[in-house]
Amino acid sequence: MFPSGLIERPANWVALAGFMGTGKSRIGWELSRALALHFVDTDKLITRVVGKSIPEVFAQEGEGYFRACEREVVQRVTRLDHAVISLGGGTFIHEENRRLLLSRGPVVVLWATPETVYQRTKHSDRPLLKVEDPLSRIRTLMNEREGVYRQGTIHVHSDGRPSEEIVEEVVERLWAWRDAQAAWAALPPDYDRATS
């Protein structure tokens, strides 16, 4: 990894949010390589700290315990520098997490259709999909969460696209975000922002 001062990048900290199966871990890893940043997967961090897989945590301790662990991990990762953070699918849903994440830096939300999510997750051991009709459950959860996911900074669709193309779009959108932030910060203090 390059020392952090040798590369110009659009952001030194980025989080990836979105529904399960949208590609957050894969894209996060590749984005971290493209930006020469560390990569942290919050679900993997939780399993390392707790010493159990996420399905085991859900089964043995319950979803409430898992969400408490998730909140603690969010507090930790928002203190990091030079990192790309892949969030669990439900992490951004909780207001305290969302507030911390959005105040720390850009949150890129990855999107995919329910059918794509189902195809990507149908052979996994995801606790929220242990139901009779997982596709219906995916549709319901995605509909419930859509408004919250829309609060992210940048939105990118991952359906049917190679990961390199998605990463390239994320980087381009991060540069545009950084430029917009710089332009906004350059406005004079007495500028009436309501008239823009």
Curated annotation (Swiss-Prot):
Which NCBIfam families does this entry report, sorted A to Z?
PRK13948.1 (NF010554)
Q: Which SUPFAM superfamilies match?
A: P-loop containing nucleoside triphosphate hydrolases
What gene name does this entry carry? aroK
Taxonomically, the superkingdom here is Bacteria
- Identify the pathway: Metabolic intermediate biosynthesis; chorismate biosynthesis; chorismate from D-erythrose 4-phosphate and phosphoenolpyruvate: step 5/7
Q: Which GO terms describe its cellular component?
A: cytosol
Q: Which residues bind substrate?
A: D43, R67, G89, R145
Disulphide-bridged cysteine pairs: none
Q: Please give one Pfam family short name.
A: SKI
* Gene Ontology biological process terms in this record: amino acid biosynthetic process; aromatic amino acid family biosynthetic process; chorismate biosynthetic process
Q: Where is the protein situated, by its record's location annotation? A: Cytoplasm
What residues bind Mg(2+), as annotated?
Answer: S25
Q: What is this protein called?
A: Shikimate kinase
Q: What class of enzyme is it?
A: transferase
Q: Which cofactor does it need?
A: Mg(2+)
Quote the cofactor binding remark: Binds 1 Mg(2+) ion per subunit.
Any one GO molecular function term: shikimate kinase activity
Q: How does it assemble?
A: Monomer.
What organism is listed for this UniProt entry?
A: Deinococcus radiodurans (strain ATCC 13939 / DSM 20539 / JCM 16871 / CCUG 27074 / LMG 4051 / NBRC 15346 / NCIMB 9279 / VKM B-1422 / R1)
Query: Where would you say this protein principally sits, based on its record?
Result: cytoplasm
Q: What does this protein do?
A: Catalyzes the specific phosphorylation of the 3-hydroxyl group of shikimic acid using ATP as a cosubstrate.
Q: Is Cytoplasm among this UniProt entry's keywords?
A: yes
Binding site residues for ATP:
G21, T22, G23, K24, S25, R26, R126, R161
Instruction: Tell me its EC number(s), please.
Output: 2.7.1.71
Similarity annotation: Belongs to the shikimate kinase family.
